[in-house]
Regions:
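N-terminal alpha-helical scaffold/docking segments in eukaryotic complex subunits
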Residues: 1-94, 165-225
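Eukaryote-skewed repeat-based solenoidal scaffolds used as protein-protein interaction platforms
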Residues: 80-198
Length: 225
């Protein structure tokens, strides 16, 4: 078992990974034992190569245990590498907080699409998550589908932290990219007349150009969603 007294969530994530890739348990322990930002950032970058990107595929007991630690949303889209990267970020937040901003900024700028997606999936797990709003907003403006999907789907961060105009823009971006609105955490509570009107315009534009409107546009019906 990976034990980290100051970082129980990180320890739990690493244990989940170690169960799935037991040959890498020693590496996970080695990195966790020396949680300086340089070591953690290197491990973050190497996660896919060392562990692969197979689905995390949690069972019911594992989901319940994570929920007890505050992770009560779906991790169905997470890979083993995503869980590991989330653990390294949480360790950096708990043990090297002064260096966390640089860590995140370097990975956001230099990491591949999978690393950037992992950053976004991990944002809700970080203390004082609101401070990373600019990182999420920058991803919203990007054009890499995998990165946008990590922000839109099964991620409570936007509904919790985005202001109305930014949240609405994200929903419209999701519609344009044909991402499933059913996987937007907290969408129902954030639907406004303004958003419903904008979504109706998207549908009208699609029909006018001979394209099918998004299948789950009904979720944005004002007073219904």
């Amino acid at each position: 078992m990976v034990t980290l007294a100051r970082s129980p969530l990180a320890a739990h994530l690493l244990e989940l990974v170690a169960r799935r890739v037991p040959a890498r348990r020693a590496w996970l322990r080695e990195v966790a034992a020396a949680p300086d930002v340089r070591t953690l950032e290197t491990a973050f970058a190497e996660a896919s190569r060392r562990l692969g990107a197979a689905p995390l595929a949690l069972d019911a007991a594992e989901r319940t245990a994570l929920s007890a630690l505050g992770v009560d949303w779906s991790l169905e889209a997470w890979g083993i590498d995503d869980a590991t990267r989330a653990a390294w970020l949480r360790l950096a937040a708990d043990h090297a907080a002064a260096d966390l901003e640089g860590f995140i900024e370097r990975r956001r700028r230099s990491g591949d699409a999978r690393q950037r997606a992992a950053l976004l999936r991990a944002l809700p797990l970080l203390p004082d998550a609101q401070q990373w709003l600019a990182v999420a907003l920058e991803a919203r403006r990007g054009d890499v589908r995998a990165v946008l999907e990590a922000l839109v789907c099964d991620n409570p961060y936007p509904a919790t932290h985005f202001h109305e105009v930014h949240f609405d823009d994200l929903v419209l971006a999701a519609l344009e990219a044909d991402l499933p609105l059913a996987r937007m955490v907290g969408l129902g509570a954030r639907v406004t007349e303004r958003l419903a009107t904008a979504a109706a315009r998207v549908a009208a534009t699609r029909r006018a150009s001979g394209r099918r409107p998004p299948a789950d546009l009904w979720r944005l019906a004002w007073g219904v969603a």
